[in-house]
């Protein structure tokens, strides 16, 4: 099954994702500028290059998480051939050899392909996703070179590329192809222009409609996504590419500066609301969750000596939390050490999602079952896990620890602290030195 992969965090969010299936030819909903069914134009005395029109086509976000980042393509209108071809860099195939292994390793292969502009627009119209086009002011000879490049790029031996969620995705490929046609003027005008935003900023705001995915990405992404990015880098988002080229000036035929965008049109306007402009501030919610987990563990640990239900409850709470954090720690360590998912490298969340949670889980189970020998190791290890979580918080003032993970700390630290306190209480009950001896009867 072939799928339209889209951009950025969509692949990272779900990995294996279904895309749009191109629809049949449009039946009148798209303006007359689409000329797929018109005969070739016969020119008299004019260069065929001058008749080419190049558009940036941008598709707005959809409802699903993997659609929230938008999409884009390059549209070439060629009246000489009588064609309207849209070139899409966001395709992948579930049937590719070792597809799942490549995804896990961060070595996904995507490809580009041309489609009828009519059917392409119609597929997004049916999905209720906005479609905008911008006619670009590119010199005639460069338009022809761009068309040749895209046709070359579409050949089976040239179409595949190693997909990276932020640095080399379907939008950056469109950006780079246009920049190539303009002799590097897009990069020149945007590479040093700061945005004050980061890759994580955009990932958070665009996944805020799905809290589990939001949390998973907040956990999995490390330092690389928290540095400020330029306008050039921000064009990993199709809508950012659309915005930034709108304000860009390029060299015109007379040597002066002219706007890159000659005109803009909306081919279809979605009825869906726009994504939020900023990420949500959910730290209090995560803190509340951490306090509930930690408070429950501590309360159950205090009463576990007298009530069997409390011991069972303590075991359930600690099992769920420690299993989740231990497995999460394994995943984070694996992403950093064993894969090409560079966005997950140098992840401070390893101080919160601690691999030591797994041996602690085993010790806590033995402690609950009455093992006195497990009491001290369990208490020491639980305190160590909580201390490491606290260290993650105390390191935040230092400039080297700039990862945006306050919400994860707010969740993990109270939970680890509450479990450590509950384990310490149970360990004291199992320690023979703290058990009261039966009172001796007098005379």
Q: What positions do the PLM features span?
A:
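Soluble extramembrane regions of membrane proteins in the secretory/endomembrane system
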Residues: 34-275
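Core alpha-helical transmembrane segments of integral membrane proteins
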Residues: 248-342, 352
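Intrinsically disordered and other compositionally biased segments
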Residues: 11, 20-21, 438
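N-terminal secretory signal peptides that target proteins for export/translocation
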Residues: 1-14
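Generic detector of multi-pass transmembrane helix bundles and their immediately adjacent loops
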Residues: 323-443
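Intrinsically disordered, low-complexity coil segments
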Residues: 41-44, 50, 251-255, 306-313, ...
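Bacterial N-terminal signal peptides
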Residues: 17-29
């Amino acid at each position: 099954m072939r799928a339209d992969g889209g951009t950025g965090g969509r692949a990272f969010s779900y990995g294996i994702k279904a895309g749009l299936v191109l629809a049949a030819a449009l039946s009148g909903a798209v303006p007359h500028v689409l000329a797929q069914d018109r005969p070739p134009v016969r020119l008299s005395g004019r260069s065929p290059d001058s008749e080419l029109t190049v558009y940036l086509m941008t598709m707005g976000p959809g409802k699903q998480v993997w659609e929230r980042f938008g999409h884009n393509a390059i549209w070439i209108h060629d009246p000489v051939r009588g064609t309207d071809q849209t070139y899409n860099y966001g395709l992948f195939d579930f049937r590719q050899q070792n597809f799942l292994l490549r995804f896990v390793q961060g070595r996904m292969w995507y490809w580009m392909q041309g489609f009828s502009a009519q059917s392409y627009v119609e597929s997004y119209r049916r999905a209720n996703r906005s479609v905008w086009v911008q006619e670009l002011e590119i010199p005639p000879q460069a338009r022809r070179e761009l068309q040749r490049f895209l046709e070359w790029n579409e050949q089976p031996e040239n179409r595949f590329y190693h997909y990276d969620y932020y640095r080399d995705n379907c939008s950056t490929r469109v950006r780079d192809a246009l920049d190539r046609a303009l002799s590097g003027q897009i990069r020149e005008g945007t590479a040093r222009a700061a945005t004050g935003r980061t890759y994580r900023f955009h990932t958070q705001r665009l996944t805020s409609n799905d809290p589990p995915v939001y949390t998973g990405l907040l956990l999995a992404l490390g330092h690389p996504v928290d540095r400020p990015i330029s306008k050039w880098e921000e064009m990993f988002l199709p809508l950012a590419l659309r915005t930034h080229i709108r304000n860009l000036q390029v060299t015109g035929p007379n040597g002066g500066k002219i706007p890159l965008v000659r005109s803009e049109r909306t081919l279809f306007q979605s009825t869906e609301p726009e994504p939020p402009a900023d990420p949500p501030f959910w730290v209090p919610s995560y803190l509340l969750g951490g306090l509930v987990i930690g408070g429950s563990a501590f309360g159950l640990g205090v009463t576990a000596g007298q009530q069997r239900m409390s011991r069972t409850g303590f075991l359930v709470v600690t099992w769920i939390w420690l299993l989740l954090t231990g497995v999460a720690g394994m995943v984070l360590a694996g992403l950093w050490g064993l894969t090409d998912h560079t966005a997950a490298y140098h992840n401070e969340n390893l101080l919160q999602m601690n691999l030591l949670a797994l041996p602690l889980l085993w010790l806590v189970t033995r402690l609950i079952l009455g093992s006195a020998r497990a009491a001290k190791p369990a208490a020491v290890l639980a305190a160590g896990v909580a201390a490491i979580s606290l260290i993650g918080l105390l390191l935040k003032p230092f400039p080297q620890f700039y990862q945006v993970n306050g919400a994860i700390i707010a969740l993990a630290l109270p939970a680890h602290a509450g479990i450590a306190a509950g384990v310490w209480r149970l360990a004291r009950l199992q320690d023979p030195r703290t058990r009261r001896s039966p009172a001796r009867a007098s005379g």
